[in-house]
Amino acid sequence: MSNIAPQVLRHASRACSRRLSLSASLVRPAYSARTVTGSGSGGRRYVSGSQRHNAQAQTTVESAVKTEQKASVPGTAVTGDALANPSAGILKQATIMDEGNRPIYLDMQATTPTDPRVLDAMLPFLTGLYGNPHSRTHAYGWETEKATEQARSHVATLIGADPKEIIFTSGATESNNMSIKGVARFFGRSGKKKHIITTQTEHKCVLDSCRHLQDEGFEVTYLPVQSNGLIKIEDLEAAIRPETALVSIMTVNNEIGVIQPMKEIGALCRSKKVFFHTDAAQAVGKIPVDVNEWNVDLMSISGHKLYGPKGIGACYVRRRPRVRIDPLITGGGQERGLRSGTLAPPLVVGFGEACRLAKEEMEYDSKRISALSQRLLTSLLALEHTTLNGDPNRHYPGCVNVSFAYVEGESLLMALKDIALSSGSACTSASLEPSYVLRALGNSDESAHSSIRFGIGRFTTESEIDYVIKAVKERVTFLRELSPLWELVQEGVDLNTIEWSQH
């Protein structure tokens, strides 16, 4: 970390404290009338009636603070405006912290950076607009309720749903648990619907939810996938039976990026009168999603996977035909009784704004990410013994999973310490076991261990991709030269014919 960063942070803290104390002393008429005015960020704030004559003094304070900040941090690329205004300064955050020493970020499947425009939308609800959105007897509650309902509408519009079908949760993990356990327990009480179908390549929270239900007496069928990561519709149709309550199949896989045939799956489930749930955390905001066209009954969405804040997500629950679920969290009956607890307006508003931006900019983002992905993939596959994991056609371009034969994935990650990458799901990254997703594709342990996932997103640049290509080629070549297996391969030896002795 840069040695100037502590100085910057201490000074910014002092400046902020000084500004707040001066504001408090300048504007403190007791019991003065309040009016609602517009704010520069598009939100609303309460101001006292006597604040008008203090406006000039407040402007002077702001100007003095910025001037002092500029003078106190010479040599940085951060302006006083950026330090005083968090929304302006977020794009310079890396400069403040490390002066350019942070790795290139290519782990977009783990999380995405918060879009600065999302932060702009959130800021008023972290300060002046602090009402409980469920308090309907005064203006503080009304204004936050209006904002949360607008956010709900943005989420619904993104997936072609009705706003009343959107239930806010803490994220996709909760939404997956809520959907799978909720439907299974509601319809399993009769004892007639105690069968669930999912795939072997689902996210860990889906697989764990199914295992918990198995402990409760439910039967679960784990469908295999083909070598390209896609299921066979024939296998799904054969697995459905009269006691099947739910089919849960993710839209875009978080490790290999394959896109399952959602229309065909949804049509089959609807014809068999079986509820269809999909974990769409890696799809919503990145590819076109329509719950009605796909005949989806339940869908899990995550805010931080589409440039929104962490800790917020949504569960789409269809109203017609109605889907009945047992809630996981009970209490005050918020969110139509399906998810009790007070909503966090800053997170909800940020999530809604992220969805609005995703809808508005999806076509542009998609074309740009596709071009960067093709540039990366073409160069990487030019290396010997390098393969793309997953179907090359039914594939989200922002997720590129490549196996580099005769190179240990963990060694390559360490060699690429200037690039933030992953060898698989962030939820299983602490495990040294080979990826269960790649194993389900039929990959060997060696192939699974040699895989690296490249995540490309909205803020990835062409120069970053070019740097990554150069670095990967150099370091893969270097690591292979250290491997005795690579030497044998170069000599034309078939490693499968070697009988290895054990000591």
Swiss-Prot record:
UniProtKB keywords: Iron, Iron-sulfur, Metal-binding, Mitochondrion, Pyridoxal phosphate, Transferase, Transit peptide, tRNA processing
N6-(pyridoxal phosphate)lysine modified-residue sites: 305
Subcellular location: Mitochondrion
Pfam families: Aminotran_5
Transit peptide residues according to the UniProt entry: 1-27
GO molecular function: cysteine desulfurase activity; iron-sulfur cluster binding; metal ion binding; pyridoxal phosphate binding
Binding site residues for pyridoxal 5'-phosphate: 172-173, 254, 282, 302-304, 342
Reaction(s) the record says it catalyses: (sulfur carrier)-H + L-cysteine = (sulfur carrier)-SH + L-alanine
Keyword GTP-binding: no
UniProt-listed InterPro entries: Aminotrans_V_dom, Aminotrans_V_PyrdxlP_BS, Cys_deSase_IscS, PyrdxlP-dep_Trfase, PyrdxlP-dep_Trfase_major, PyrdxlP-dep_Trfase_small
Positions that bind [2Fe-2S] cluster: 427
Alphabetical list of PROSITE patterns matching this protein: AA_TRANSFER_CLASS_5 (PS00595)
EC number: 2.8.1.7
GO biological process, one term: [2Fe-2S] cluster assembly
Reported cofactor(s): pyridoxal 5'-phosphate
Record: active site: 427
Region of interest called Disordered, as start-end residue ranges on this chain: 34-58
Major place of residence: mitochondrion
Secretion signal span: none
Residue stretches of biased makeup (Low complexity): 34-50
HAMAP family: Cys_desulf_IscS
Family affiliation: Belongs to the class-V pyridoxal-phosphate-dependent aminotransferase family. NifS/IscS subfamily.
Job description of the protein: Catalyzes the removal of elemental sulfur from cysteine to produce alanine. It supplies the inorganic sulfur for iron-sulfur (Fe-S) clusters. Plays a role in both tRNA-processing and mitochondrial metabolism. Involved in the 2-thio-modification of both 5-carboxymethylaminomethyl-2-thiouridine in mitochondrial tRNAs and 5-methoxycarbonylmethyl-2-thiouridine (mcm5s2U) in cytoplasmic tRNAs.
NCBIfam families in the record: IscS, PRK14012.1
The protein's name in its UniProt record: Cysteine desulfurase, mitochondrial
